[in-house]
Amino acid sequence: MRQFEYKERMKRLLTPNIVSLLTKIHEYKGEQNLFIEPNSDKLTELLEIAKIQSTEASNKIEGICTSDDRLKQLVMDKTMPKTRNEKEIAGYRDVLTTIHENYEYIPIRSNYLLQLHGDLYKFTGLSVGGKYKSVDNVIAEIDVNGNKSIRFQPVEAWQTPEAINNICEAYNDALNDGIDPLLIMPMFILDFLCVHPFNDGNGRMS
């Protein structure tokens, strides 16, 4: 079983450039309250734009598309999904909304990841939602001649629940030790994608 040790790996990330960037980010975050209240309408507008762009990009990378008008209506929850693609987009919209509105109350734990994945597919009727992968998967590519080759071999299906528990534990241990979340999150996301825990929807979940 792979080992996940964020507290040790974090030390290698503390380059002068990264430390400088972290300092600036936290400095600007401390100043943002000066701009939030007088610009609340503009910030709300920017948030809606960000949701639309995130939904479009995250779904398109997995080949899930619809027209621009339909996408905007779906993200704004002003229409019902008609096709399978639109049902998956609507599920992503709801998961994104859940995270935006409740992120402070969503712990990084296996059962919560499964719940969010189930919500991702709640409009589709597909049985893959809310379950870890049942078969091994690979990250493969096909060259111009049609030859398929394996780029990456994720964790095997039978090891997946334990691997996810381990990365969640590593994340929480590092967070409880006071390590900056901006350092922990990219390590967690990379490990999540390397585990590739679901039969479908790994990119959108990350």
Region roles according to the model:
Residues 1-206:
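FIC/Doc superfamily catalytic core
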